[in-house]
Structure formats: C-alpha cells, structure tokens
Amino acid sequence: MEDIENIEEDEYGFSRNYFLAKELGGASKRSAHKLSDIHIVDEQELRETASTIEMKHSKEISELMSDYKTMYSKWVFELRCGFGLLMYGFGSKKALVEDFASASLTDYSVVVINGYLPSVNLKQVLLALAELLSELLKCKRKSSGSLSKGQETFPSRSMDDILSFLHGPQSGDKDCFICVVVHNIDGPALRDPESQQTLARLSSCSHIRLVASIDHVNAPLLWDKKMVHKQFNWLWHHVPTFAPYNVEGVFFPLVLAQGSTAQTAKTAAIVLQSLTPNGQNVFKILAEYQLSHPDEDGMPTDDLYSASRERFFVSSQVTLNSHLTEFKDHELVKTKRNSDGQECLNIPLTSDAIRQLLLDLNQ
Amino acid sequence: MAPSGTVADPPQCSTTDSFNSSDTAENDIRPFFVLHKASSGNHNGKLTGIVKSKRRIESPSPKIAKRSEVESVEEEDGQFFSTLRFKVFETVWSKIEKTIEDVLRNSNSKVFSGIHDWIRESFESIISSGALKLSEAVRSYPVLTQASSKQLLTAMVLTRNLEMVDDLLTFEELELHLKSQGCHVAKLSSMDFSAKSGVGGCLRGLLRQFVMPTVDVADVTILASWYRENKNHENPVVIIVDDTERCCGPVLSDLILILSEWAIKVPIFLIMGVSTAHDAPRKILSVNALQRLCATRFTLSSPAERMDAVLKAVFLKPCSGFTVSHKVALFMRSYFLCQDGTLTSFVRTLKIACLQHFSLEPLSIMLEHFCHDGVNQLSGEGTELLTEATMKHAFDLPSVTRNKITRSTFEMLPHFLLDLQRMPNPWSIVVLCLYEAGKFDKLRLLDIFCEILDPEARYLKYFSPSEIVNSQSHNSGRNNVIRRVLRKLRDLSPSQLSSMLKSWENLTAEFTEINDKVIELHPFMRAVEAAGQRQGLPNSPKKHASRSNSKLEKELKAMTDKVATVIEFMLREYMKPVESVPFHEILCFKNVDKLQSALLGDPRGRIQLDLLESHDILHCVCCSQRGTTLLPSMHDTSILYKLAQEHADVINLHDWYQSFKTILIPRSSKAKQKSKSSSKSKKRKEICEEPEAPAEALIQARFCRAVMELQITGLIRMPSKRRPDFVQRVAFGS
C-alpha cells in the first residue's frame, strides 16, 4: 500500500513539474536572444580547446573508481550466477567496465562491442564469438582427452545457426562462457529493434554473458518484458563515474559550432572551390546581385541566365540548371517565388557571410 | 555492497592509464575487438583453484568461510566469493528452480493431457475417415472440394494472462509433453510471422523443425512427402503458435489457408496461445482463414493461482531453507501487483534475492545443509563445521545479540540451528491452515504470507472481545488479512466448516500438537450437523437461517467459537515469524534496498539525481559547502543541468550560455576578464581554491561539452531547424 502511495506521489511530482515548466513557457515570453549574439570562436579552435578541457575532481573520480573496484568480485559472482550486468549512472563507464573486464574476468575471453560508434555489424561480432568459442571448446576437449569433432567454418552460416551454436549445452562445469562487453547498448547503431533482438538472443545463450552500459535515460524502453526477464536478465548497477564522454561524444556535433556565419561561409567556400570556374562565376553573379539588392527575395532565374550567358559562363539553360542543381544539393542556394510569381534564387547566408565568401573566392 | 572507501590503491589506477594508451585509442574506434582470451586455467574448469588452495592453507577447516579471513581476503585480492559459495548457491537455486518448474508443470498437467486427448481422438477420426495412397498424398491436386475436409483442427489455449512472458515456458512444456507422446511438434512464435518474410518464412521455419534444419525452401509438398516417409504418418503433426495476438494477421491467415488445403493429406493440429479474449483470432485473421478453423477451447490457470502454488512450494513446504524477511516479501508483493504482474519476474526477483543473500552473508553457505532432506544432519556434521571464526560471526548477528545469547551458551548453537531447520514446519502448517480458512473469502496466499512474516504483528489482539465487536461493526480491516479470516469464519456454513476441518486435519497430520486440537473439534462439528439435519437445512448459510433454527445457530456459534480458539492457540504457540528467531540471518534475506536497486534500475531518476547532487556522489570538499548555490568548481554538466531547471520546456541557448558563463567567471574577476577576454591563448587551470576566469574559447568548449553530455543522457533535445536557438528539455523532475 505504501508503495502504491509513493508511486502516486512520484507521478504527481513529475506531472506537476511538467506543467509548471509548460506554464513557465507560456506565461513569460520566450527569450528572443539569438545564438549568433555570442561571439563564437572558430569550430577548429573550439574542438582543439575541447580536447584540452581539464577534468574537474579527477581525484574524487579516481577514488570513486577505486571504490567500484571493491565490487568487482561481486560482479564476477553475479555473472557466474547467470545474470547480465547493466551499468548506468552519469559519466562515461567505458574505462570502468574495461578495467573490470581486464582485472577480474581474466579467466574468460572478453569481447568488447563499441555501441557508441555509428555502425556496428552484429553478424561479424557473432562470427568472432563463435570462432572464439569453438577454439575454447577445442582446447577443453583436448585437455579432457576426448576426440574433437571437425568444426565447420562459420562465415557461411546464418545468424540462427551461430546463435544456436553459442547456445550449445554446457558440458560439466557451468563456467564455460565468453563475456561480451557492450559499451552503450543504447548507442545509435544498436538502437533499432532488430539489433536489440539479436543482442537479447545472444545474451540468452548459455555460453555468453553480457556486461553492458547505458547512458540514455530512456534506454529501458528498448526492451520488452521477454527481453528483460528471459533474455538479458539484467542486474542493475548504479555506477556514476562523472568521467568525460570522450569517445562516446566524438560523433555528436558541437552545439555552438552550427549556424555561425563564419562557419557557413567557410563550408560554402570549400564547396565552391571544388566546382568548375564557370560554376563559381555563376555563383558570384548571384552573390553580387543579392548584395546589391538586399531587400529583394532573390535573383529571378531568367535574369541569372541572361547575365551568365552575356559573360559566356553558360551556353544554355541546361548548363545553368546543372550548376544550380549542384548549388541546391549543397544548400548554397534556395528557390523561392516572389510576389510576381517569378522563381527567384536566394543564397541563405547573411550579407556579411556573402562578402566574406566572395573575398575567399577571389583569393 | 557499499564501497568502503578504504582501498589501498593509489588514485592513478589502471583505468586512467589504460584509457590513455595508444593501444586502447585504436580499439575505441573499432566496432568490436577481443579484449583478451581466457587464461588457460579455465580450460580445466578449475576457475578459482589457486585461491581455493590458498585458503586451505590458511584455514584449518576449508569448508566454511571465516569472517575474519573473508575480510582480509576481500582486501587482498578481492576473491571474496569462493567456489564453495558459488557451489552452494547453485545447489540452493537449482533446488528452488526445480520446485517451481514442478509446480508449474503440475498446474498445467490437466490441460496438457486434455490437449493430447483431443489430438488423439481427432487424429483417429481423420485416419478412419479414409487413408490416402502415397501418390495421392504428396500431390497438391485433386483439389478437395468438400468444406469439411478443409477444416483445420485448432486448439485455442487461453492463457488468462496478458503478459506473454509467463507462458513461454508453458508452451515449451506443452511441446515437450506432446513430443513425449509421439507427436511431431513444431513451435512458431510471432517472430516467424513477420510481414517482411511473409508466409514463406514461417513455412521454412516449419520445414526446418520437421524435416531437417538446413532446408531453405518454402514448399509445403516437402512437408507432405516427409510425412509419408518412415512411419511418420502414424503420428499427428502439431504446430504451436504461442503468442497469436502478436503475429502478423495476414501471414498467419495465409499459413492457415495453405495448411487447411492439405488438412486431409497431412493431419495438422494447430495450437494457438491466446492471451486476451477467446475472440482474439476474429480480430487478426481474415474471414477465409477463420472459416477453416475448427476450434476447441482450453484454459490455463491464472497467474495469481500459479503464484500461490509457487509460494506454497518454495516457502511453506520443505524446499531449500532459503527464505525472505517481511520487508522483502512486501516489496516482492508490491512489485508483482503494481509493477509487473508476471510470475517470471517474481521468480527472477527471488533469484536476485537469493544471489544477494549469498553475496552478503558469509554464513549463507550453511544453507547447503538445509537443502538436504534429512532432518538431523546438522546435529552431527553441523558442529564440526563451526570454527572459531564462524562462531564469532554467528554470535555477532543482530538477532543473536538481541536475544542476549552469549558465547557462554556455546553448546546451544547446534541446538538453535536445528531449531531453525525445524522451525518452519509448524509455522508453515499454521499459515496453510489460515490460507484454507481464507479461501472462503478469496484471500491470496501471497497476502497472508506477507502479513504473517511481520515480526511486529500482534495477532492475539484480534481475539479480545472488544476487537471482535469492532471488526463486526465496520469494515476497516481490509488490509488486515488475519482479521478478515477470523471474521469470515463466523459467516461460514456448516458444510464449509466441515470441509475446512478436513483440510486442516490433512495439513496438520504430521504435527500432533495441532492435530489433536483439530480433532477435538469433531464433536462440535457433529453437533452442528445433527442440528442442521434436524432442521432439514444442512447447507443453508447462517445468515439466512430462520428463527426456528435457533438450535442450529447456537451449535454453530459454539463451533465457530471453538474454531477461533484453535486458531488463537495456533497463532499464540507457533506463529513465530522467522525474523524473531535467533540466527535466522543465515537463511533469511533481509536487505530490501539492495534487492530493489538491482532489480529496478531507475536511469531516468538516478541520472538526473547524479547531476543535481553530484557533490554527494563525488564527496568533494569544494562543492558541498554552500547549500544550493552553484559554484564554478562543480562538474560542468551538473552546473548546466541545474541551470536548465530554471527554464521552461525549451531553453534559449544564448541565455543558457550566458548564465553558464556567469557561474564560471567569479564575480571578483569579472571586471578583469572584460579587458582580457580577447586573449584566447591563455588557457588557465581552474582550481577549486583560487578560481580564475577561463578564456572565452574554453568556456565555449566546456559549454559544448556539457550540452553534448546532456544530449548523450537524453535529457535535452538539440535545436531543430525550426527552432535553431532553443534546446528542448525532455525530463522534468526525477
């Protein structure tokens, strides 16, 4: 009964917070400040500086890590008892989990999957696991003196076959398993239902134990009850490390590095420099027009054609269109209809950025 | 296990070292890699052999882990969990697991044999209707035109449980059961019925299970010819689909249509697990397919019934000796009722509790002796197990010190242990007796079990006259199971009373003290029956008895009074909750917090709390001084997330950045900072004691890093094209 009340209270608090936040948004007008009001440093410099950020509380963090070290033996015990370990809490757990694996799981083979990478091929992982296991079993058979069966090669087999091989009967002692460490099992490459199904089936194999970490607050939504209770069989461990997400964050964009004028002008210049001189010249006409007519919606396509043809940059509408397609693909140009219904071309950059861009091109 | 914080390791542990080495840097960008291969020690299956032998030398009696030794070992090499402990856990858990499996099998056995009988009978009738020649049977023509010959015999198994998880095992058992009876069985699940692979996928799945595992074509004629081979046709073919509702409807319909075309040539029986309602197939199958089904209904027992059966077998009948405390039982009950509702999760909870017990309590290895069936094992063998260190730990247990048992009563320990081992028997008999009585009020064993474990309960107060009047006058006792039992007792009809007495007699058969009391009730029962017969209304409930039944009423009253006295006697004499017994810690798991945190991770709440209360976790001196004010020494992401709390559901990036900057630049140095802000090259360290303003680029980089970390945790959503200057908050409150 108490629990039910607690749950209700929690839910009440949650919804109250939500509505308070919503109300706050409605009542006071949203701040109109723009990101561009900040003088943002160059992305290159931002990235360089980011790599030199010093870790705060490094002493406390390493103390925290060594506190967790005392639990390693317990974790091994839990793995041996057939559970999977799921690490969560704020901070990168990559170092912690790998340290655990290299310090305490020396008796077992350990395979690490980096789930934070944008692409992970699970079939290859399964193949590697199957090969490791067959090696292990061969060694075992040799030492126990029984004859080893000829092993087929795995690459030709399907996922189901490999999984059923990994789920083979345990011979004698139950301690013959390979430990699979999955950093960020909720990572971008593993977030789709199929990968999660495969991982769930993998974790329920008799020769496999999983140690995984999650970082996203909603990660448990990836799993249904069958996966949770029958397959992953998680034991949760709250192990906040406060360590920086160095590798995990590599594929995330920097929030301040988007949309700044210098930045877009620079990327546009890079794109333009890879185009033909004629293409560049067409773009220059467009840019100059836009600078001299700042109040208009853009340059009408026909005008651009005649201007470019006059200067012998294009010979026909077809060549102009091919240039325009190139511009549009790289988001250098957008088309709009003006009040007269004419198709107009517009460069989605500020005047300053366009001036900068023209300077860069003329160098 | 709480981190003790007293670890000899210097701060520069291998975690940071390995992190920076070039080798791992390369591994960081590989999708996967082999960290290391198993050391050769494992190949002989002697995992902790070294440790074991080491212990042998240290301890004169290696059979038991000594506390002092355990502590030293824990600090030295972390090999706290010896092979022995693992072995005992295995023994105990496999015993519990087997018990549960047996219970579930028994609860299903009636339905299973019903299904098998149905298959047998229908199969024989099909065979007798006309056997086909081989050549006819493997051809897809002539097309059968009679409607009756296209009927696919189907068993709908109602699971009465919305959660499929519990029934996975049931259907596996059913498969084994039917296979053992000679049927050809294949099991398909909703995964096989995906729209992607279509009907071909499930046909392939069927052929793989029936014919051979390497078949890769979907052709039903293969099934037909296989069926005619080597006497295969002497037995029926059964296909089990365990979660019908989750299958892709059109694919399942297609399969039914195809199979029904072949129904005479290959007599196929379809078993469909249905969890919602018996008309569920109508919702997912096409009309054509529905017409081909000839359905029979079977019903499994409900999860609550199974739950009670499991509870009875694991805790109230002699099983492993392992038990749980009142708080743990309450938690398990509320988890079952409020959160999950599946027996599977209940069993999992039990396993985690058992595991935690073994990892927390060194003496838990003594459970091994409770697992054995013999009662007097401990008296002989037990004493020799008791080394000095064990004794010390045992006499330090709270339950022992509380009961003022001291070392002077050293010889008493075996006696107490024996008592522990014997103790549950009269206790569990009483619980089961109460359960029998509670059945008339539809009480669940789970509820009774939870209440009866309460070490602070005072049951006897219910027997005071004022309480009886009270309980009759108003309905407050809803939570109070035992009070409900007592009240219901007074409303029982004579026939109900007599059936209750019979079950009590059976339950107490092995325990003469209670049994005698129960037998003493017989004369009263006979008097009631006699009175009832005289009135000619032996079965009428007391309430509806007319005034002329006063004699019967009087007898009934006497009878129920007597029964209440017997219950009072049972409660008074034997209702000693396990937690009040000395040394119960050896077999009773009590740490509900550990169980909860291992079972139910709460990333949503905990990750937010990590950020909001980072200094509590880091235990740093610099940040925890001044209450709620944000300090520049705090973790960047933590500062940023705390700032985010002040915003509405969307956060203006500019404002957020500015307030972040204000925190990082202490007020005193702000004036200085303005003049210097252009000099980007100055990258200064920020130290807790003398905070100096960092350069603009560094602040921006730190802001970016913190936003990125919040994005990784999923607490914010990044700016969209439509709203380029705002991020969105995703979580509100923890």
From Swiss-Prot, chain A:
Keywords for this protein: DNA replication, Nucleus
Gene disruption phenotype: Zygotic lethal mutant phenotype. Seeds abort early, with embryos made of up to eight cells, characterized by enlarged nuclei in endosperm with arrested cell cycle. These phenotypes are partly suppressed by mutation in MEA/MEDEA.
Signal sequence range: none
Tissue specificity comment: Expressed in female gametophyte and embryos, and, at low levels, in trichomes, pollen and the mesophyll of leaves. Follow a cell-cycle regulation with a peak at the G1/S-phase. Mostly expressed in siliques, flowers, flower buds and leaves, and, to a lower exent, in roots and stems.
Superkingdom to which the source organism belongs: Eukaryota
GO terms, biological process: DNA replication
Induction record: Regulated by E2F. Accumulates rapidly after cell cycle reactivation by sucrose addition following cell cycle arrest mediated by sucrose deprivation.
GO cellular component: nucleus; origin recognition complex
Main location class: nucleus
Subunit details: Component of the origin recognition complex (ORC) composed of at least ORC1 (ORC1A or ORC1B), ORC2, ORC3, ORC4, ORC5 and ORC6. ORC is regulated in a cell-cycle and development dependent manner. It is sequentially assembled at the exit from anaphase of mitosis and disassembled as cells enter S phase. Interacts directly with ORC1A, ORC1B, ORC3, ORC4, ORC5 and ORC6.
Protein family membership: Belongs to the ORC2 family.
Descriptive protein name: Origin of replication complex subunit 2
Native source organism of the sequence: Arabidopsis thaliana
Gene name in the database record: ORC2
Swiss-Prot record, chain B:
UniProt induction comment: Regulated by E2F. Accumulates rapidly after cell cycle reactivation by sucrose addition following cell cycle arrest mediated by sucrose deprivation.
Any single GO BP term: DNA replication
Subcellular location: Nucleus
Amino acid composition bias (Polar residues), ranges on this chain: 12-24
Signal sequence, renumbered to the chain: none
Coiled coil: none
Name of the protein described by the UniProt record: Origin of replication complex subunit 3
